């Protein structure tokens, strides 16, 4: 027992001596790096001298040799410390990877940043119904229609079709694009519709109609982009009438059924105008013995009972604003079981004005595949990417740059002080004979100018969102019929409304978004006529807005006033950026004076979203925020 007790201290001492033999001294990081540098220096000294300095530099950039195995001493001949230092650190590896990676220029960094922003902005829920999203339903082929172009168009060589598109300045993007049609007779429209076109003075199709009508008639989904006054309305109205006519002739509609096709507009005035265009073609068809086609104007501010009476009889075509349409569908007064044709007119404005959620709710009521068309004069890249999610093999037809100003409009920009605008407005009214359109940002300015003009004896009317529907309709009717000389309006009248005789548009103030400016001046210079647009600017406008205006004037080859020419322009030479990124100007709002990284519209929407989230978190007001 004593022997065993005596042996245990001896065993412990032997174990301690073994641990001391295997013990490796801890070497601090700084010392390991110094040892590594010393080892590399000795390696370089042991090699023969390089022939030139450039070769020495190249050799210094090479990675260090792999470390020796654990049981093999390092090149320095040291102990365990050098063995530990042979493995390169993460910092050394990162430096080597940075040296090996290709150098990225500042322009390439900006392009990558913009691309990430656009992908993030376009990464929204797709424009599909809840049923399609839930069941994972996707459509790979577009809808088939009974329409075919004439044989000579079907046999047209592709080279000739491309030559015609170049001649008409038409850009197309898509697979299996139908050939362009230079004559309305090639579209195989009924004779009463062709006769009505001739009565309206429309003899030859415009560029957007040359390519757009064959695309839509063949059943393809389409994004149509063309400057204001180019005839986009006929591109989706004529095929819609043909769809309704074909469905009625195959199987007549029964009470409570329909519609077969639908057009959604951002404003009541634009919806009413589109509805009137449809009726102009339906009247001669009915007189010629074709089946009756019943359209429905579905807008707010009008008694719903009259609209429900049309629905009960059975409706073929619906022209609507999102709010009233959503209301009818939610109350199950109308269904979209048979709807196969959908057009979003001024599609980018529908999204920007906050109708995106309403449109999604409308999409939820579709029961089958439909042909979807999107049209606008200003269609930024982010809207195009977002819209493609709802389309099946879409064809993009572009006449000119999206967001470009109409070249038939002479743009004049005047620097006018805030308090001198109303007096200078009277002088500008003398430039051209009536009718004249005056635009303002605020409803209060519209009412003020309207009263001032009436006091000066000018026959004027006014419209804005604060007036009831009857006042708005009467104002536009009096102005179109020539009973009133001047129409004062907010941007509610700037999108899509057609006033064919207007020679002069006056912007009492410069809109904050360049898209609204393009829509405003597009009310004149329509159908090939020349018009004048006068814009008042002053120190209240932001520099970004003025730079966008400057680039727009330069693109349209218009005179640039000295106050704009003197602005410091960071994008004066952005040709390289535009060529490498494929996007000219801002991809979010379409402005040419800034890039998407500096877009004021995007910043404004971000701040609005943050304010909305705070309001949701802290409550909507009332006592202690409970309301």
UniProtKB/Swiss-Prot annotation:
Ranges for domain Helicase ATP-binding: 213-397
Top EC class of this enzyme: hydrolase
Signal peptide: none
One GO term of the biological process aspect: mRNA splicing, via spliceosome
Domain Helicase C-terminal, chain residue ranges per copy: 408-568
CDD domains in the cross-refs: DEADc_DDX41, SF2_C_DEAD
Keyword annotations: ATP-binding, Helicase, Hydrolase, Metal-binding, Nucleotide-binding, RNA-binding, Zinc, Zinc-finger
Residues that, per the record, bind ATP: 226-233
Motif (Q motif): 182-210
Residue numbers spanned by region Disordered: 1-23, 40-85
GO cellular component, one term: spliceosomal complex
UniProt motif (DEAD box) ranges: 345-348
EC number: 3.6.4.13
Catalytic activity: ATP + H2O = ADP + phosphate + H(+)
Zinc finger (CCHC-type): 584-601
Compositionally biased spans, kind Pro residues: 62-72
Bias kind Low complexity: ranges: 1-15, 52-61
Pfam families hit by this protein: DEAD, Helicase_C
Domain of life: Eukaryota
Free-text comment about domains: The Q motif is unique to and characteristic of the DEAD box family of RNA helicases and controls ATP binding and hydrolysis.
Family note: Belongs to the DEAD box helicase family. DDX41 subfamily.
PANTHER family: ATP-DEPENDENT RNA HELICASE DBP3
Name of this chain's protein: DEAD-box ATP-dependent RNA helicase 35A
């Amino acid at each position: 027992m004593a022997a065993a007790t005596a042996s245990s201290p001896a065993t412990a001492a032997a174990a301690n001596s073994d641990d001391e033999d295997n013990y490796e001294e801890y070497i601090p990081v700084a010392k390991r790096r110094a040892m590594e540098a010393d080892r590399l220096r000795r390696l370089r000294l042991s090699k023969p001298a390089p022939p030139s300095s450039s070769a020495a530099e190249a050799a210094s950039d090479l990675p260090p040799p792999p470390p020796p195995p654990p049981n093999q001493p390092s090149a320095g001949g040291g102990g365990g410390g050098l063995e530990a230092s042979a493995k390169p650190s993460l910092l050394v590896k990162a430096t080597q990877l940075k040296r090996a990676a290709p150098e990225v220029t500042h322009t390439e960094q900006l392009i990558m940043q913009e691309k990430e922003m656009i992908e993030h902005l376009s990464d929204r829920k797709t424009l599909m119904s809840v049923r399609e999203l839930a069941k994972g339903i996707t459509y790979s082929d577009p809808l088939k229609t009974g329409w075919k172009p004439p044989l000579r168009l079907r046999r047209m060589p592709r080279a000739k079709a491309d030559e015609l598109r170049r001649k008409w300045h038409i850009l197309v993007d898509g697979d299996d694009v139908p050939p362009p049609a230079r004559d309305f007779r090639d579209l195989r429209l009924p004779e009463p519709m062709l006769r009505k076109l001739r009565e309206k003075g429309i003899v030859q199709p415009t560029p957007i109609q040359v390519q757009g009508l064959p695309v839509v008639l063949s059943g393809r989904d389409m994004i149509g982009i063309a400057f204001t006054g180019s005839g986009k309305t006929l591109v989706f109205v004529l095929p819609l009438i043909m769809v309704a006519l074909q469905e009625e002739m195959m199987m007549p509609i029964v009470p409570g059924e329909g519609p077969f096709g639908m057009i959604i507009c951002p404003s009541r005035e634009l919806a009413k105008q589109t509805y009137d265009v449809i009726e102009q073609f339906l009247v001669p068809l009915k007189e010629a013995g074709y089946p009756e086609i019943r359209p429905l104007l579905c807008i707010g501010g009008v008694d719903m009972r009259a609209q429900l009476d049309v629905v009960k009889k059975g409706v073929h075509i619906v022209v609507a604003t999102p709010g009233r349409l959503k209301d009818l569908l939610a109350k199950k007064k109308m269904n979209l079981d048979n709807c196969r044709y959908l057009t979003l007119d001024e599609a980018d404005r529908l999204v920007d004005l906050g109708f995106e959620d309403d449109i999604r709710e409308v999409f939820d009521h579709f029961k089958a595949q439909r042909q979807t068309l999107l049209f606008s004069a200003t269609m930024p890249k982010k809207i195009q990417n977002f819209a493609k999610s709802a389309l099946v093999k879409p064809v993009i037809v572009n006449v000119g740059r999206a967001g470009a100003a109409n070249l038939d409009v002479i743009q004049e920009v005047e620097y006018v002080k805030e308090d001198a605008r109303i007096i200078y407005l009277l002088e500008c009214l003398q430039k051209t004979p009536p009718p004249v359109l005056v635009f303002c940002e605020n409803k209060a300015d519209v009412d003020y100018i309207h009263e001032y003009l009436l006091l000066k004896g000018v026959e004027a009317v006014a419209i804005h969102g604060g007036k009831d529907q009857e006042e708005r309709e009467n104002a536009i009717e009096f102005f179109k019929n020539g009973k009133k000389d001047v129409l004062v309006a907010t941007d509610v009248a700037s999108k899509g409304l057609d006033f064919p005789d207007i020679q002069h548009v006056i912007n009492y103030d410069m809109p904050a978004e360049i898209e609204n400016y393009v829509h405003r001046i597009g009310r004149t210079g329509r159908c090939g006529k020349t018009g004048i647009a006068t814009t008042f600017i002053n120190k209240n406008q932001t520099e970004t807005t003025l730079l966008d205006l400057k680039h727009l004037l330069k693109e349209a080859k218009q005179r640039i006033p000295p106050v704009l020419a003197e602005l410091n322009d960071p994008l004066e030479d952005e040709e390289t950026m535009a060529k490498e990124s494929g996007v000219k100007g801002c991809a979010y709002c379409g402005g040419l004076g800034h890039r998407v990284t500096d877009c004021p519209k995007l910043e404004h929407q971000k701040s609005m979203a943050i304010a909305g989230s705070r309001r949701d978190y802290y409550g909507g007001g009332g006592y202690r925020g409970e309301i």
